[in-house]
């Protein structure tokens, strides 16, 4: 699952640039472009016009209404998909940390000293490693 030794080979400057460009391009595609093209008003222009005439004509406020397909698409692309990806990423991190903690615990049990012996320097390092890995649990 985790391969920290090949991270530098996988995360090249080009790949980082593509990921960053995607982080900016996706919001532009789901917000700026459709709003400027009027796609968010398809089917509800009559409602917007009614609201304009009901308000004071000297007012400086902005009426922003969107149709259901646009609202659903934006919600899915901008919230639900990133939310799902973050939950999956954190789940993988959690599972990996639990596996590593279990492996460390098994290694520590395999090297446990017999009763009655004084602890050696190796046992001190094992105890230190145990306390340092509690964060992974």
From Swiss-Prot:
Q: What's the protein here called? A: 5-hydroxytryptamine receptor 4
| Sorted UniProt keywords | Cell membrane, Endosome, G-protein coupled receptor, Glycoprotein, Membrane, Receptor, Transducer, Transmembrane, Transmembrane helix
Cell compartments where the protein resides? Cell membrane; Endosome membrane
Coiled-coil annotated residue ranges, if any: none
* Annotated SUPFAM superfamilies: Family A G protein-coupled receptor-like
The answer to whether the entry has keyword Glycoprotein is yes
| Similarity annotation | Belongs to the G-protein coupled receptor 1 family.
Q: How does it sit in the membrane?
A: Multi-pass membrane protein
Q: Where are the transmembrane segments?
A: 12-35, 67-90
Known glycosylation sites: 58
Q: Name one GO cellular component term.
A: endosome membrane
What the protein does?
G-protein coupled receptor for 5-hydroxytryptamine (serotonin), a biogenic hormone that functions as a neurotransmitter, a hormone and a mitogen. Ligand binding causes a conformation change that triggers signaling via guanine nucleotide-binding proteins (G proteins) and modulates the activity of downstream effectors. HTR4 is coupled to G(s) G alpha proteins and mediates activation of adenylate cyclase activity.
The organism encoding this protein is Sus scrofa
Domain note: Specificity for G(s) G alpha proteins is determined by the length of transmembrane regions 5 and 6 (TM5 and TM6).
């Amino acid at each position: 699952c985790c391969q920290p030794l090949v991270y530098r080979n996988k995360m090249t400057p080009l790949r980082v640039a593509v990921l960053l460009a995607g982080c900016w391009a996706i919001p532009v595609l789901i917000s700026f472009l459709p709003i400027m093209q009027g796609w968010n008003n398809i089917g509800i222009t009559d409602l917007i016009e009614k609201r304009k005439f009901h308000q004071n004509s000297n007012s400086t406020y902005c009426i922003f209404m969107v149709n259901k397909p646009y609202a659903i698409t934006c919600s899915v692309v901008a919230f639900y998909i990133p939310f799902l990806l973050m939950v999956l990423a954190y789940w993988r991190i959690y599972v990996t940390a639990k596996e590593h903690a279990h492996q460390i615990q098994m290694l520590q049990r395999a090297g446990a000293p017999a009763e009655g012996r004084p602890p050696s320097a190796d046992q001190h390092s094992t105890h230190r490693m145990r306390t340092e890995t509690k964060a992974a649990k």
